[in-house]
Swiss-Prot record:
Its EC number is 1.14.13.-. This is Elongation factor P lysine hydroxylase. It catalyses: N(6)-((3R)-3,6-diaminohexanoyl)-L-lysyl-[protein] + NADPH + O2 + H(+) = N(6)-((3R)-3,6-diaminohexanoyl)-5-hydroxy-L-lysyl-[protein] + NADP(+) + H2O. The gene is epmC. It comes from Escherichia coli (strain K12). Keywords: Monooxygenase, Oxidoreductase. It comes from the Bacteria.
């Protein structure tokens, strides 16, 4: 983690943006990430990110930004997660649903001045996903957002990140075409 980026900052930024309007708070978790809607025990929605990892918080915020109102009323937005160890077909389906969240991850990371790394999230799979091809799909979605507009919640979060970290407005030049990944 970059010495200038701490998960506590994301909690502060996110909660100042969304705690009141969306009754949602970002919470550091000790285990796997999960989204929990308000219930009888806790009167607010919780985005719980993994182990205090800055990148995990960014990614879970991305999923929340994509989820519509009905999905935000369901545990983990009503999605099932296919764990690491996916075959080629399941990995392809996983990547299809990860393009938009990872595009938001990239936008958020640039707005925060934090390094972005695409994640195929299949370390135990029976084949090696093509990270460059996947990042090109993510790049195309980033360009679409920059050209056609970023939805309201992620745009609000981007503006808050830029204000906090004193970063410039987002431009296409900040998102290079993935030639190869190290």
């Amino acid at each position: 983690m970059n010495s200038t980026h701490h998960y506590e900052q994301l909690i502060e930024i996110f909660n100042s943006c969304f705690a009141d309007d969306f009754n949602t708070r970002l919470i550091k978790g000790d285990d796997e990430p999960i989204y929990l809607p308000a219930d009888a025990e806790v009167p607010y929605n919780r985005i719980v990110f993994a182990h205090g990892f800055y990148a995990s918080a960014i990614h879970e915020i991305s999923h929340w930004c994509i989820a519509g109102k009905a999905r935000r009323e369901l545990v983990d937005f009503g999605y099932w997660y296919c764990p690491d160890g996916r075959d080629a077909q399941t990995q392809s389906q996983f990547e299809d649903v990860e393009v938009k969240p990872q595009a938001l991850d990239w936008l958020f990371c640039v707005a925060a001045g934090y390094p972005f790394n695409v994640s195929c999230d299949n370390l135990e799979g029976d084949f090696e996903p093509d990270r460059v091809v996947f990042q090109r799909r993510v790049h195309a979605q980033v360009m679409d957002y920059l050209t056609n507009g970023i939805p309201e919640r992620p745009a609000r979060f981007i503006k808050a990140l830029q204000n906090y970290y004193h970063t410039p407005e987002l431009t296409a030049e900040q998102f290079p075409w993935p030639e190869a990944l190290n």
